[in-house]
Curated annotation (Swiss-Prot):
Signal peptide range: 1-27
Thermal effects: Thermolabile.
Record: residues binding Ca(2+) 2: 388, 427, 435, 437, 440
Statement: the UniProt record of this protein carries the keyword Repressor: no
Family, as annotated: Belongs to the peptidase M4 family.
Propeptide residue span(s): 28-249
GO biological process per UniProt: proteolysis
Protein name, per record: Bacillolysin
Residue positions binding Ca(2+) 4: 443-444, 447, 450
Residue positions binding Ca(2+) 1: 307, 309, 311
Natural source organism: Bacillus cereus
Pfam families attached to this UniProt entry: FTP, PepSY, Peptidase_M4, Peptidase_M4_C
Keywords for this protein: Calcium, Hydrolase, Metal-binding, Metalloprotease, Protease, Secreted, Signal, Zinc
Length: 566
């Protein structure tokens, strides 16, 4: 059944040059490959690894800047120094390779370049091993960057609001930030305007308003939905408020209750007894888990879910039971598997709201919490009833706090695929009838065997399974839910093996699939990573974990080749 008609504006093609065997090893004999990947359009490196510099006693940031200054011609920095062209955003240690990871943002005369982020790995002996991320070239030659005439940010917000065509109630006050923006072959200054709202339908829009002319150059919605079929939630008259309704966290005693989920199965629930009520507030993990009731309205977060006897068996409770339980299981998967403490690896609370709107056929991550509709009973049942859906949406938050892949075009499709991969792995972790379908537990409840997407066979639901079959239009943010099928198929082949388009892949299992993609997403992917760059990052991640000459590295290469990504 065809679920959607989407398309993707794809980024430029890539050329890869691999040279000279294996570079010197990272710590603990984890190897770094010697690879150079060039962007064919701008002819500058976008992923380079190997023995890039000699060992020094310098700080990691200085090592990276020294290398970039020596390679100014390759990266087309012009007369600007590396120190003037990049701003260090984060410096962290990588336990796997005992290296230092430096994340950077490209800037031009102090103004950040949209989507141009880089990540570098410097070994403990002070040598640069990996530099990932596309650099915007020849900015000093761009005529529009010489134009200092700009409209005010407030005017840019006004233009974006006019283009939006509705007057929403904003969740966050609109703001406009100045960026250097690459608009096709033209580079200009643009205000990036963020409009975040829930009514009339959820939106977290980014508008790109040219700073001198006020022209709308681009716009897209970064609300991360599980499906692109986003119909506005129909609002009902607000239920009468309970005078005892609670929004803020409560203090009390940890308890264990029970409840029935959307599919009728019984689950144990970590709750908090405060006063005479039991709240869906789980204090037992490194991150507190909260579950709220929107009461069929579109106000967030709603009221903290409460019950009188710690038995959540009413039909209305089911969506909350699953949202609460599955959020905990998703936390457990990331903690047990990667020692990650919540979505930001720093114990951020996990907030979920159920009964959002009326008959709302979607679920989404809005940048700060999870939101689930009840479905209309035909297309969807309550969307919190799918553990892969919850794992999918919370993985968007993990990505937001690591690579921060832009939710448009190839980087957006990669973002979606990563969420499908880990949503599926969370389902396997909980061993709840696991499979390689997405949303099968909550999609078309009256039709057995149906799902939103299939990782084993994306074409089953109209999605491409090979790069040659990709969509090249602009709907759905450039087809983020459609072209994710290409990476989904690659991931399935990597885990399970098989022959696809004449390429045979030796499967390495789902656990190693997760390890490679988690490392690639947190260590090598950047905001604008394309499928081709993702291949390079995943190959290096496998080399870090299993060795440069390992079967796992070979399998990663095979799996990407099988879906036409080189």
């Amino acid at each position: 059944m065809k679920k959607k008609s989407l398309a993707l504006v794809l980024a430029t093609g890539m050329a890869v040059t691999t040279f000279g065997g294996t570079g010197s090893a990272f710590a603990d004999s984890k190897n770094v490959l010697s690879t150079k990947k060039y962007n064919e359009t701008v002819q500058s490196p976008e992923f380079i690894s190997g023995d890039l510099t000699e060992a020094t006693g310098k700080k990691a940031e200085s090592v990276v800047f020294d290398y970039l200054n020596a390679a100014k011609g390759d990266y087309k920095l012009g007369e600007k120094s590396a120190q003037d062209s990049f701003k260090v955003k984060q410096v962290k240690k990588d336990a796997v390779t005992d290296s230092t990871v430096v994340r950077m943002q490209q800037v031009y005369e102090g103004v950040p370049v949209w989507g141009s982020t880089q990540v570098a790995h410097v070994s403990k002996d002070g040598s640069l091993k990996v530099l990932s991320g596309t650099v915007a070239p020849d900015l000093d030659k761009k005529e529009k960057l010489k134009n200092k005439n700009k409209i005010e940010g407030a005017k840019a917000i006004e233009i974006a609001q006019q283009d939006l065509g509705v007057t929403p109630k904003y969740e966050v006050e609109p703001k406009a930030d100045l960026y250097v923006y690459q608009n096709g072959e033209e580079t200009t200054y643009a205000y990036v305007v963020n409009l975040n709202f829930l009514d009339p339908s959820p939106g977290n829009y980014y508008y790109f308003i040219e700073a001198d002319s006020g022209k709308v150059l681009n716009k897209f919605n970064t609300i991360d939905h599980v499906t692109n079929d986003d119909k506005s939630p129909v609002k009902q008259e607000a239920p009468k408020q309970d005078a005892k309704a609670v929004v803020k966290p409560v203090t009390g005693t940890n308890k264990v209750g029970t409840g029935k989920g959307v599919l009728g199965d019984t689950k144990s629930l970590n709750t908090t007894l405060s006063g005479s009520s039991y709240y869906l507030q789980d204090n037992t993990r490194g991150a507190t888990i909260f579950t709220y009731d929107a009461k069929n309205r579109s106000t967030l977060p709603g009221t903290l879910w409460a019950d009188a006897d710690n038995v959540f068996n009413a039909a209305y409770d089911a969506a909350a039971v699953d949202a609460h339980y599955y959020a905990g299981k998703t936390y457990d998967y990331y903690k047990a598997t990667f020692n990650r403490n919540s979505i930001n690896d720093a114990g951020a609370p996990l907030k979920s709201t159920v009964h959002y709107g009326s008959n709302y056929n979607n679920a989404f991550w809005n940048g700060s919490q999870m939101v689930y509709g009840d479905g209309d009973g035909v297309t969807f049942t309550s969307l919190s009833g799918g553990i892969d859906v919850i794992g999918h949406e919370l993985t968007h938050a993990v990505t937001e706090n690591s690579s921060n892949l832009i939710y448009q075009n190839e980087s957006g499709a990669l973002n979606e695929a990563i969420s499908d991969i880990f949503g599926t792995l969370v389902e396997f972790y909980d061993n709840r009838n696991p499979d390689w379908e997405i949303g099968e537990d909550i999609y078309t409840p009256g039709k057995a065997g149906d799902a939103l997407r299939s990782m084993s066979d994306p074409t089953k639901y109209g999605d491409p399974d090979h790069y040659s079959k990709r969509y090249t239009g602009s709907s759905d943010n450039g087809g983020v839910h459609t072209n994710s099928g290409i990476i989904n198929k690659q991931a399935y082949l990597l885990a399970n093996g098989g022959t696809h388009y004449g390429v045979t892949v030796t499967g390495i299992g789902k656990d190693k699939l997760g390890a490679i993609y988690y490392r690639a997403n947190t260590q090598y992917f950047t905001q604008s990573t394309t499928f081709s760059q993702a291949r390079a990052g995943a190959v290096q991640a496998a080399a870090d974990l299993y060795g440069a000459n390992s079967a796992e590295v070979a399998a990663v290469k095979q799996s990407f080749s099988a879906v036409g990504v080189n």
